[in-house]
């Protein structure tokens, strides 16, 4: 197999195209495939707050592979060994949470690169990513198809944003609204005017630096606002929240005293 690796999600980011995504927290390949047939540009398979194992992530990657929706994997942390596993099962785009400094960003880049450019362990012959050794010259071409996104979601990270943006190998920065608002002293209140101001200025700084800017907005008006500020990969919902809301709304049609979806906090 002499296939060239490609990453449509990364290619579209390079062109500055807007991509609309969906957060997957349900942990099942069945739900992931349903989402993949809906037409979202990208699907975030969450390993940080959803109880996904490596095998769960693997099965969801398999489920969405036949479709145009591009998978993005968020591991639970920036662990070098965990990043190695996630890459080996075939993830091409990673979203790394809680990156606060340029040094941390450089460590993440190193974890995704094979020597001599980094510290990723070599195991292509047993990895789905290399089709079990059948993709010729996998190690030589993989860096071009790898897309690395980091999350800025604390006051410390905001203080180091410019330095993080200067790190070679970082393709985009994602603003984490829930953790960021808590870090700024406004827990569960990402809609606070000061938080909104900081989100706007951060998105504009990211784009001015030539990087992609991402966001998760469960409220449609907030998603539209982030797009207007320049964000170019925006998730507009979470599968478990959408499912929960739909269940509540359907029940409210038939049971008195039910008034639709429950109030949900920030995510």
UniProtKB/Swiss-Prot annotation:
Q: What is its EC number?
A: 4.1.2.53
Q: What class of enzyme is it?
A: lyase
Please indicate which residues carry the site annotation Increases basicity of active site His: 88
- The site (Transition state stabilizer) lies at 74
Say if the entry is tagged with keyword Nucleotide-binding.
Answer: no
What InterPro entries would the database entry show? Aldolase/citrate-lyase_domain, HpcH-HpaI_aldolase, KDR_aldolase, Pyrv/PenolPyrv_kinase-like_dom, Pyrv_kinase-like_dom_sf
Assembly, per entry: Homohexamer.
Sites binding substrate sit at 151, 178-179
Q: Which residues bind Mg(2+)?
A: 153, 179
Q: Which cofactor does it need?
A: Mg(2+)
Report if keyword Metal-binding is assigned.
yes
> What HAMAP family does UniProt report for this protein, alphabetically?
KDR_aldolase
Organism annotation: Escherichia coli O7:K1 (strain IAI39 / ExPEC)
Recorded superkingdom: Bacteria
Give GO MF terms, alphabetically: 2-keto-3-deoxy-L-rhamnonate aldolase activity; magnesium ion binding
Q: What is this protein called?
A: 2-keto-3-deoxy-L-rhamnonate aldolase
């Amino acid at each position: 197999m002499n296939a060239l690796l490609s990453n449509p999600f990364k290619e579209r980011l390079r062109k500055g195209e807007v991509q609309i995504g969906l957060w997957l927290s349900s942990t099942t390949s069945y739900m992931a495939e349903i989402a993949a047939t809906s037409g979202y540009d990208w699907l975030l398979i969450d390993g940080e707050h959803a109880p996904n194992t490596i095998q769960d992530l693997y099965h969801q990657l398999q489920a969405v592979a036949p479709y145009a929706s591009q998978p993005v994997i968020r591991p639970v942390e920036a662990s070098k060994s965990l990043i190695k596993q996630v890459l080996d099962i075939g993830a091409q785009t990673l979203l790394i949470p809680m990156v606060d400094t340029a040094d941390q960003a450089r460590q993440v880049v190193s974890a995704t690169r094979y020597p001599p450019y980094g510290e990723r362990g070599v195991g292509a012959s047993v990895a789905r990513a290399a089709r079990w050794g059948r993709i010729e010259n996998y190690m030589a071409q993989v860096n071009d198809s790898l897309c690395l996104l980091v999350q800025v979601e604390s006051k410390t990270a905001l203080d180091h944003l410019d330095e993080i943006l200067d790190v070679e190998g970082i393709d985009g920065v994602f603003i984490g609204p829930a953790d960021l608002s808590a870090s700024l002293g406004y827990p569960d209140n990402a809609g606070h005017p000061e938080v909104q101001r900081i989100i706007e200025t951060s998105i504009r700084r990211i784009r001015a630096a030539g990087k992609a800017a991402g966001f998760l907005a469960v409220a449609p008006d907030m998603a539209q606002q982030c797009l207007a500020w320049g964000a170019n990969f925006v998730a507009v919902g979470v599968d478990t929240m959408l499912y929960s809301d739909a269940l509540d709304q359907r029940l409210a049609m038939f049971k008195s005293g039910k008034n639709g979806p429950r109030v949900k906090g920030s995510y």
